[in-house]
Amino acid sequence: NFLKFTEWPPGTTSDEIVLCTSKGNTFEELDAISGKIAQSKPVRIKRISSNDSTNDCQLLFLAREEGPERIRQWLTLIGNKPILVVSNINGFLDLGGMIALMNDGRNLYFEVDLARVRQANLKLSAQLLQIAREVRSR
């Protein structure tokens, strides 16, 4: 649902929304999103390595299996590009990420670093921010 509640700068999306993930990612739930519609556009999953271009990615999902060091490398590579970066690794916001997916054993929830989102010139809907467990704005 992050794709539905994110606004990208003009000219950064084409006729589809591209959700990128690292090639080593085994988070199979992402495959179920492929072909779904978000913001009236089909969603395509693209598996990439750090050597691949991220220019057509609107969202980059980094699985916890990447580990903190590798995730820091990805975040450096992305910089302030208008790409929403999401991960399920503990401490993702402290690493410099935008949205951290969390599971406390009973519930799934998420936390947002709004300052990082804004640095990338992205906007998240008020609806999405209201249901976040934590919103950091530094």
Where are these regions (language model features)?
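Short hydrophobic alpha-helices and adjacent helix-cap/hinge residues
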Residues: 2-138
